Amino acid sequence: LIAFVYCSVLYAQHIKLFSQEKIVILGNKYVAQNIILDAMNIDAEESIFSYNLGELQDNVESIEFVKSVKVSRILPSTLMIQILERAPIILVLLDDEKYFFDIDQTPLLANKEAINFFPVPIMTFTNDDPIKLGDFQLTTALRFVIKSKAIHNELYENLSEVRYKNNNLSLITDERTKIDLGDDEAIYKISILKEFQHTINDKRSLNDYSYIDLKIDNQIIV
């Protein structure tokens, strides 16, 4: 039996039965296929069994905007690459660079192509000291975006800018409504804003107002 299996393998190699003839890449929307193929660095003449699937996976996962990868073989001669891309939720403008961040707070360098591809709100800081990657204020601001999106996704989907000015937080909607949240209890105020929106829903929307002020406790000024 062992001899039969060995001979079968030799014969398959001889006729190049398992030579890689096709690569199927699924799930990529932003990351170009040629970038993925370059990262894999494979030889089309090799058998699909000559590759370490774990190494191929690691190589593709090293590409920015790729979150996870599954590599599998389909006999006799196909490699399948299933891609899960990162989904940016905010574009942060820092002094020296622009970064996207996803729900895991992973920084992703934002070039012009990426900015045009991902239509997400921007976050700006106007502070005495410049904000840098890893700063506590940036981490806090990202947590606010993630939590507020979970609480009031309708507002997030209509958001153009998240604006910090010396710790005072303002939101600007796509229709240019300015929502002032002040410098504390921002998440609680998002919940209040959601309730307010439900209250007025039959008659008007938040975009009907040019200005909404929640800086004063237990008050909404429009």
Residue ranges and their predicted role:
Residues V9-A114:
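Terminal hydrophobic membrane-targeting helix
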Residues F18-Q20, V31, E64, I74-T78, ...:
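Extracytoplasmic
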Residues G27-K29, I83-A87, T124-N127, T173-E175, ...:
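Flexible glycine-/small-residue-rich
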Residues L79-E161:
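Extracytoplasmic segments of membrane-associated envelope/inner-membrane machinery
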Residues L1-L10:
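Hydrophobic membrane-insertion alpha-helices, especially the h-region
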Residues D135-T199:
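Soluble extracytoplasmic domains of inner/organellar membrane proteins
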